[in-house]
């Protein structure tokens, strides 16, 4: 490859001491070497900061934050200082295959109108294997993100946002993550939505990224029930995108704060109804199980004794 533009790789880190070396080494071992690698410690409480400072490579830049920003604030600040013509992302508990950056750069050099490029991925950890089907073409990606609907994409294998590489033009045009989504599950999707409104996208149909959902990860913490924002973030995102696409209303604009609050309440309501439906479904499934029927049978004499009048 004669033309070798600089690629900035951002690796946000929070309490990932046990995994971060694998993630960073997967970038250091990329066959494409013209990189600047930003290791971003978002106020970890373990020894993550010490781990990332121990790497000895002149391509690495370490940035540490005194207060946790839920990833969004830290990444946005670093994005203001990147020098790369293209920007790639790597989650600190995942890892990339050696050819990932090279393959993505080649796509940008082929198509100068490209603003964002993803790759296929492989599940690692408790769940293994490849996703069943993902969006590959610009048309498919736009259908996934510009017509985003939580109820439509549930049960599918969505595009894996951490695999994305974007052009500097896409960054300058969209500005990074919206601060409203700090600590929510949808921060990547909302930003990608804004990029795909203005630029072409593509997914390389090769598993060049290894994705792990582990207990303690940011994704796990968001989805395990401890984070109240998780329950309604998806339906809320659907409403925000719908308003923007069909009614040309930027719900996140300051002047629309009251509308945002209304949509938050609606999303909470919908999430609660969905949760109750799920609980009811689980209850019915359990009542059909052999263990439930056996329990009822074993307890039937006690119920007769309890109800008997003396």
Functional labels for PLM-detected ranges:
Residues 26, 41-50, 67, 91:
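A conserved acidic beta->alpha catalytic loop
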Residues 87:
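Short aromatic/hydrophobic "clamp" motif used to bind/position activated sugar donors
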Residues 80, 140-233:
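Conserved nucleotide-sugar donor-binding catalytic segment
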Residues 243-310:
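Boundary detector for helix-to-coil junctions that initiate low-complexity/charged tails
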Residues 18-21, 46-54, 95, 99:
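Acidic helix N-cap motif at the loop->helix transition within catalytic regions
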Residues 65-82, 103:
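Glycine-rich, basic loop-to-helix element that forms the pyrophosphate-binding segment
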Residues 99-133:
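Conserved donor NDP-sugar-binding/catalytic core segment of glycosyltransferases
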Residues 1-28:
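N-proximal low-complexity "stem/linker" segments adjacent to membrane-targeting elements
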